[in-house]
Amino acid sequence: MNYFDLFSLPVIFPIDQTRLSETYRELQKQYHPDKFVMQNDSERLRAMQKSTEINDAYQTLKNSCLRAQYLLLLAGLDIALEHKTLQDTAFLVQQMEWRETIAAFTEDDQDKMDEFALQLQQQVAGLESKIEVQLQNDELEATADSIRQLKFMLKLQIELVLIEEKLFD
């Protein structure tokens, strides 16, 4: 059973996050290991495994990047453990510029940081839309490249948060 089936969701990139969360809570109640404490060892083990599967599926489906990777896996392309890098020169140059921008922020740049965070969020949203279209068109290699870009953007968002915490805490 794939993760989408487990949560009774269609196998598509955009998902109903509310429905995902509601189904997660229902499944966790149903398969929580504490409910099986009086069962035999094999039933307790089965409940623990099912609970772990539910948690893994939920973490994968709620995260757009992991969800896109999982859809690629279902389509026959596994990029989870690859070490392939982007070959998009323009994006690589943009990466360097973004990193320089983040490195240059000071305590006086809160407004600039907020603006930059908004730009990053717009980039992420654009990549997610691009991935959705690429998946619909079965453009697996192009989707893989977009996922690599999305991973970078999500890491960059985390770096920005860490810089803000360092500067303002």
Curated annotation (Swiss-Prot):
It holds the Pfam family DnaJ. GO terms for biological process: [2Fe-2S] cluster assembly; protein complex oligomerization; protein folding. GO terms for molecular function: ATPase activator activity; protein-folding chaperone binding. The keyword Chaperone applies. The keyword Protein transport does not apply. Keywords: Chaperone. Residues 2-74 form the J domain. CDD domains: DnaJ. It comes from the Bacteria. PROSITE patterns: DNAJ_2. One of its GO terms (cellular component) is iron-sulfur cluster transfer complex. Interacts with HscA and stimulates its ATPase activity. Belongs to the HscB family. Co-chaperone involved in the maturation of iron-sulfur cluster-containing proteins. Seems to help targeting proteins to be folded toward HscA. This is Co-chaperone protein HscB homolog. The gene is hscB.
